[in-house]
């Protein structure tokens, strides 16, 4: 129970290349957490002293790191970690990654960097010999087939593009068939698979 912790407040640092994202995170941090510092930078360019942070976590935060920079980013993550680290990240089977790849193929001519996957992260941790444990969870995001506006907004957020509406997604020769398979028995169903990766230096 953090409210009974002997060390209060719990100082919290925020890191993101987007000032908007940092501001949004700052709004929801509540006691006993207290924002002590903010870093508007990428993880791979982040500079800190070795083992600065007792705990570091990245919850669905590493998708946009290019594949060729992912190892550097993870090394920075581990460099700053004094005790424990936690990464929650979708696998290649997850809707989030699959749909983004279809989006790149269907609307960007195949150009663009696919989201990084949990499998890539695990492979790098193995290569750099970092002890870790993994727990896989699966779940589904579902809503009525008639909830078109909600689904449109959700899919736009998945690809960070609000210029393409649901109708265009459904008519596209690549995203369309994929989305058709996400409708079953009058329900939209988006299957997710997430790897929870626990790292420790203890």
Which role does the model predict for each range below?
Residues 116, 126-202:
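Conserved Class I S-adenosyl-L-methionine
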Residues 15, 59, 88-90:
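Alpha/beta-hydrolase-fold catalytic nucleophile elbow
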Residues 1-46:
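Class I SAM-dependent methyltransferase SAM/SAH-binding core
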Residues 83-116:
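Conserved class I S-adenosyl-L-methionine
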Residues 53-70:
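A short SAM/SAH-binding and catalytic strip from SAM-dependent methyltransferases
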Residues 52-53, 82:
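Local beta-strand N-terminus motif with an aromatic residue
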Residues 10-11, 84, 131:
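Residues at the starts of beta-strands that form the adenosine-phosphate
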Residues 69-86:
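A short glycine-rich, Lys/Arg-flanked "PGG" loop and its adjoining helix->strand segment in the class I
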């Amino acid at each position: 129970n953090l409210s009974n912790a002997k060390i209060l407040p719990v100082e919290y640092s925020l890191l993101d290349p987007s000032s908007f994202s940092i501001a949004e995170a700052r709004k929801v941090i509540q006691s006993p957490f207290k924002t002590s510092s903010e870093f508007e930078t990428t993880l791979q360019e982040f500079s800190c002293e070795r083992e600065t942070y007792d705990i570091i976590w990245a919850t669905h935060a590493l998708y946009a790191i290019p594949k060729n920079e992912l190892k550097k980013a993870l090394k920075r993550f581990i460099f700053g970690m004094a005790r424990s680290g936690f990464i929650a990240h979708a696998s290649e089977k997850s809707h989030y990654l699959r749909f983004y790849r279809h989006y790149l193929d269907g609307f960007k001519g195949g150009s663009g960097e696919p989201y990084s996957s949990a499998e890539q992260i695990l492979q790098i941790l193995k290569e750099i010999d970092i002890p870790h444990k993994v727990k896989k969870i699966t779940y589904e995001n579902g809503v009525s087939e008639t909830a078109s506006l909600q689904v449109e907004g959700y899919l736009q957020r998945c690809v960070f593009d609000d210029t393409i509406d649901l109708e265009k997604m459904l008519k596209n020769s690549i995203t369309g068939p994929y989305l058709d398979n996400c409708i079953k028995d009058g329900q939209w169903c988006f299957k997710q698979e997430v790897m929870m990766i626990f790292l420790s230096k203890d």
